[in-house]
């Protein structure tokens, strides 16, 4: 069998018509986990509807529709392989909640693919001031997606013009630099997601294209296709050696077993026999067993695993979604009284001042928080201070803000526990701002509930 391939998570960003579905569909279709039967079924349907030529996007649209109707389609459909990696596409945008998903996302992306439409007029629209492209790229960078690949799509529509390609590369390089990426470490690939040029095999339509290069710590890496660029992602480091943080998605009561909290391990490891503390509930108890997909995990749950674990002497009323479990003996999680965050306002119709109290989505918590003090306005790219104690901030601004939650919540500094240190600010049914937590004022509440099981385990 050999060693299992490393898993990486990709997020695909770009303007609404850049061809994200077709390109992603093509990769999944050619290198992916969609079984032949499903493909044949979709192709037949596409042909019957006269959408035969549209098959990649059609396959993806079908999957998307099923996903949105809440049919939990086999998640393998969103996976494909490169020689080195198992790749999961964690969000194909065009999704209303794309921004929220990216922040509270079920997982952190290791790399973003920015798809740019090369068509005349299309490129200009996608990258314009108010373009979604800018917002998505900025988000990816702010939220710690350190690696980027740029695919310049629809090159067939400009007859594989080298001049057009160079013009777009130059503009896009400036664009990604403004967002915060170093263009030298970003591969640029001209593709046709539709016809498949430079997707998996090198194209015969652009003799002028000599391939992409990117600078890495280990030196220069070269390749030709989009698949090779994905294969050249630098392997991500998974935080299993950090203390445990496991935000709860749900808490179930299961007859004959008892209370079973469920969630995704973000950092550290959760094992049977461990004594965990839930914050901000301030409840401490012993973990009896840990399982995933109804199978016991003898070695415990690791970062990225969605696990259920059985706890003793705790009722469903004691803990809830949005609580965070951690190791009671190793930097246990705590509730917070306030926290300071770098907030970037994306789209708010008015001005935001002290006293504004929208809902924050941070990991699985969904809690109203007050903008207590606007400490300073900063330059979004460099982080340098521009103004002390601004009265207001508006769309496009970045500021350091002291936030006070309306009820107990557990968050962490982004530098220490990234998934618990980024949040979306929701108001008027949209994401109006995003934030990265700089520091947390933790509440040291004495007392709290320590179960008999925990006391017993401590004596062992």
Swiss-Prot record:
Entry's localization field: Cytoplasm
Residues holding GTP: 14-21, 91-95, 153-156
Modified residues (N6,N6-dimethyllysine): 3, 317
Start and end residues of each tr-type G domain: 5-240
Chain segments carrying region G4: 153-156
Molecular function per GO: GTP binding; GTPase activity; translation elongation factor activity
Region (G5): 192-194
Cross-referenced CDD domains: EF1_alpha (cd01883), EF1_alpha_II (cd03693), EF1_alpha_III (cd03705)
Modified residues (N6-methyllysine): 3, 30, 317, 391
GO biological process: translation; translational elongation
Cysteine pairs bridged by disulfides in the record: none
Transmembrane domains' residue ranges: none
Keywords from the named record: Cytoplasm, Elongation factor, GTP-binding, Methylation, Nucleotide-binding, Protein biosynthesis
Region (G1): 14-21
Span list, region G3: 91-94
Modified residues (N6,N6,N6-trimethyllysine): 79
Classification via NCBIfam families: EF-1_alpha, PRK12317.1
PANTHER family linked to this entry: TRANSLATION FACTOR
Protein name listed in UniProt: Elongation factor 1-alpha
Lineage, opening ranks: Eukaryota, Fungi, Dikarya, Ascomycota, Saccharomycotina
């Amino acid at each position: 069998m050999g060693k299992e391939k490393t898993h990486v998570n990709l997020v695909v960003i770009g303007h609404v018509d850049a061809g994200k579905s077709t390109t992603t569909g093509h990769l999944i279709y050619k290198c992916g986990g969609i079984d032949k039967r499903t493909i044949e079924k979709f192709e037949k349907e596409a042909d019957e509807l006269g959408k035969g030529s549209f098959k990649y996007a059609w396959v993806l649209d079908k999957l998307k529709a099923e996903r949105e109707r809440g049919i939990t389609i086999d998640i393998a459909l969103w996976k494909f392989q490169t020689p080195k990696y198992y790749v999961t596409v964690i969000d194909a945008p065009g999704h209303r909640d794309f921004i929220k998903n990216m922040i509270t996302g079920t997982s952190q992306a290791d790399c973003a693919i920015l798809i740019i439409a090369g068509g005349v007029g299309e490129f200009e629209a996608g990258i314009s001031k108010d373009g979604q492209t800018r917002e998505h790229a900025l988000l990816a960078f702010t939220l710690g997606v350190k690696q980027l690949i740029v695919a310049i799509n629809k090159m067939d529509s400009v007859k594989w013009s080298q001049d057009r390609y160079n013009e777009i590369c130059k503009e896009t390089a400036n664009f990604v630099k403004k967002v915060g990426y170093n263009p030298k470490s970003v591969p640029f690939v001209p593709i046709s997601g539709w016809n498949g040029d430079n997707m998996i095999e090198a194209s015969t339509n652009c003799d002028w294209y000599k391939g992409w290069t990117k600078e890495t710590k280990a030196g220069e890496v070269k390749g030709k296709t989009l698949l090779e660029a994905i294969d050249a992602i630098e392997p991500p480091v998974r935080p299993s050696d950090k203390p445990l943080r496991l935000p709860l998605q749900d808490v179930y009561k299961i007859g004959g077993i008892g209370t079973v909290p469920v969630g995704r391990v973000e950092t550290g490891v959760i094992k049977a026999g461990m004594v965990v503390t839930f914050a901000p509930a301030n409840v401490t108890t012993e973990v009896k067993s840990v399982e995933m997909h109804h199978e016991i995990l003898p070695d415990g749950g690791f970062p990225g695993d969605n696990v259920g674990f059985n706890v003793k002497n705790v009722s469903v009323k004691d803990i809830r979604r949005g609580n965070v479990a951690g190791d009671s003996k190793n930097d246990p999680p705590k509730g917070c009284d306030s926290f300071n965050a770098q907030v970037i306002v994306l789209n708010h119709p008015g001005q935001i001042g002290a006293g504004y109290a929208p809902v924050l989505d941070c990991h699985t918590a969904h809690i109203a928080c007050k903008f207590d003090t606007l400490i300073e306005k900063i330059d979004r790219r460099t982080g340098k201070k521009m103004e002390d104690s601004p009265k207001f901030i508006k769309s496009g601004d970045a500021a350091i803000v002291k936030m006070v939650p309306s009820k107990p919540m557990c968050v962490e500094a982004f530098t220490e526990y990234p998934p618990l240190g980024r949040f979306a600010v929701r108001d008027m049914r949209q994401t109006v701002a995003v934030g990265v937590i700089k520091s947390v004022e933790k509440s040291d509440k004495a007392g709290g509930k320590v179960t008999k099981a925990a006391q017993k385990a401590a004596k062992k």
